Amino acid sequence: MVKLNELFPKHGSRKAKRRIGLGVGSGLGRSATKGMKGQSSRSGNTKKESKEGGQMPLYRRVPKSGFSNATFAKRFDYVNIGSLEKACKAGEEVTPETMKTLGLVKCAKRVKVLANGELKKGLKVSAHGFSATAKAAIEKAGGSVTVIEKK
């Protein structure tokens, strides 16, 4: 019967690792497959992929194309009416600054109120944007909605 410690891979199925730089007699010594002198033969060699040694690099040969409106996009921080219900008292005036102090938003520059959750308290909410259902839910609970115009 074959024992586990006697198992070995079939001859020729596993290739031996090349141990370079271990003496001239090994056949892979001296320059250790790195060629002669130059940056590539030195230790710690890393050439940038963008460098092509005098040839015009690919990123400069290919023309620029396209345009993205991402830089002009209006980015909002979002607050749900469920979190306003938990954090605010009835009749309270809620502005983006108060939302920031309560920890509901990270940035008070642009805030949009969404309708996830339930609102039973009448709140006076001021924000830069409201979803239609959030606006309806706030007004149904006896609150008011003020849209802040941001340039």
Curated annotation (Swiss-Prot):
Molecular function in Gene Ontology: rRNA binding; structural constituent of ribosome
PANTHER family listed in its UniProt record: 50S RIBOSOMAL PROTEIN L15, LARGE RIBOSOMAL SUBUNIT PROTEIN UL15M
Region (Disordered): 1-62
Free-text function comment from the UniProt entry: Binds to the 23S rRNA.
PROSITE patterns per UniProt: RIBOSOMAL_L15
Family as reported in the entry's similarity comment: Belongs to the universal ribosomal protein uL15 family.
Stated name of the protein: Large ribosomal subunit protein uL15
Gene Ontology cellular-component annotations: cytosolic large ribosomal subunit
Gene3D superfamilies reported for this sequence: 3.100.10.10
Database matches in Pfam families: Ribosomal_L27A
Quaternary structure, from the entry: Part of the 50S ribosomal subunit.
Gene Ontology BP annotations: translation
Keyword Ribonucleoprotein attributed: yes
InterPro entries attached to this UniProt entry: Ribosomal_uL15, Ribosomal_uL15/eL18, Ribosomal_uL15/eL18_sf, Ribosomal_uL15_bac-type, Ribosomal_uL15_CS
Keywords annotated in UniProt: Ribonucleoprotein, Ribosomal protein, RNA-binding, rRNA-binding
Biased composition (Basic residues): 11-20
SUPFAM superfamilies in alphabetical order: Ribosomal proteins L15p and L18e
